[in-house]
Amino acid sequence: MEKMPITKSGFENLKKELEHLKCVLIPANIKDIEIARAHGDLSENAEYTAAKEKQSFLHGKLQELENNLALSNVIDLKMLSDDRIVFGATVIIEEASTGKQTNYQLVGPFESNISENKISVTSPIGKALIGKSIGDEVKVHTPGGIRNFEVVDIYINPSEL
């Protein structure tokens, strides 16, 4: 499979999430199953059924995290320039129709989170921004139509270095 870019902090967050899953959530679920099993008849034991469903979910999440870590390619942001938008850069863009400015960090698909203004380089807006410079106009095709932006600033966040 193809390696996916990820920031150092994104990679560390995935590792912490995996560790929490292995050391806290899965052991707690094992105890829940044991307690529910002790209640007797498993065929009509809702507690047991719920704990087994959670076990399945947790093991699916475990596989997903292990796969994501294996496919991760940590990019050293210290080596990046801030004259063009590249993976890891934080950009400030201004929407032409409203004048509203928004900042986004371009990250890999494993760490994108719109509530943290982290968008994937594979998203429509991420693809449109890659390679642009300050002052460039950017057209983004969205389900709601074409949106026009101007690149106001590009920088590498010092906390990511």
Curated annotation (Swiss-Prot):
Functional summary from the UniProt entry: Necessary for efficient RNA polymerase transcription elongation past template-encoded arresting sites. The arresting sites in DNA have the property of trapping a certain fraction of elongating RNA polymerases that pass through, resulting in locked ternary complexes. Cleavage of the nascent transcript by cleavage factors such as GreA or GreB allows the resumption of elongation from the new 3'terminus. GreA releases sequences of 2 to 3 nucleotides.
Keyword Ligase (UniProt): no
Residue stretches in coiled coil: 46-71
InterPro entries: GreA/GreB_C_sf, TF_GreA/GreB_CS, Tscrpt_elong_fac_GreA, Tscrpt_elong_fac_GreA/B, Tscrpt_elong_fac_GreA/B_C, Tscrpt_elong_fac_GreA/B_fam, Tscrpt_elong_fac_GreA/B_N, Tscrpt_elong_fac_GreA/B_N_sf
Keyword tags: Coiled coil, DNA-binding, Transcription, Transcription regulation
UniProt protein name: Transcription elongation factor GreA
The species this protein was found in: Syntrophus aciditrophicus (strain SB)
PROSITE patterns, sorted: GREAB_1, GREAB_2
MF (Gene Ontology): DNA binding; RNA polymerase binding
